[in-house]
């Protein structure tokens, strides 16, 4: 079986001979994701919206769950900058994610369980 990389680059299937290097890469990716848990992040989406919230989890399809999420629309000529829309718990489909920015660690950040 050859290596398969999906359109958004998230799911991988390794060949049987790939060995330890794939396992180490998987462990590294898992540790990186675990280090981002409960951190605030901004997700830019393909339609121009931005969501800001606390990273709670992801799945193998690269969908992201944000807690205490707020939605920000891209300002335009007909719609000036508005107040954010409070979403609460939000699921962002992986195929709609353009970029993810993680907020620097803050001392007063809330911890979600």
Swiss-Prot record:
CDD domains: LSMD1. InterPro entries: LSM_dom_sf (IPR010920), LSMD1_Sm (IPR034110), Sm (IPR047575), Sm_dom_euk/arc (IPR001163), snRNP_SmB/NAA38-like (IPR050914). Its main location: cytoplasm. It holds the Pfam family LSM. It comes from the Eukaryota. Keywords: Cytoplasm, Nucleus. GO terms for cellular component: NatC complex; nucleus. Residues 1-29 are annotated as: Disordered. It is found in: Cytoplasm; Nucleus. Residues 28-106 form the Sm domain. One of its GO terms (molecular function) is RNA binding. Belongs to the snRNP Sm proteins family. Auxillary component of the N-terminal acetyltransferase C (NatC) complex which catalyzes acetylation of N-terminal methionine residues. N-terminal acetylation protects proteins from ubiquitination and degradation by the N-end rule pathway. Component of the N-terminal acetyltransferase C (NatC) complex. This is N-alpha-acetyltransferase 38, NatC auxiliary subunit. It comes from Xenopus tropicalis. The gene is naa38.
């Amino acid at each position: 079986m050859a290596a398969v990389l999906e359109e958004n680059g998230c799911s991988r299937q390794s060949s049987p001979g790939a060995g330890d290097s794939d396992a180490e890469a998987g462990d590294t990716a898992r540790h990186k994701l675990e280090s981002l848990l409960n951190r605030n992040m901004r997700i830019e989406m393909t339609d121009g919206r931005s969501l800001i919230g606390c990273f709670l989890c992801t799945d193998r399809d690269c969908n992201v769950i944000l807690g205490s999420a707020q939605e920000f629309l891209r300002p335009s000529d007909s719609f000036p900058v508005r107040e954010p829309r409070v979403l609460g718990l939000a699921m962002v489909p992986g195929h709609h994610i353009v970029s993810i920015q993680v907020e620097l660690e803050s001392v007063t950040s809330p911890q979600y369980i």
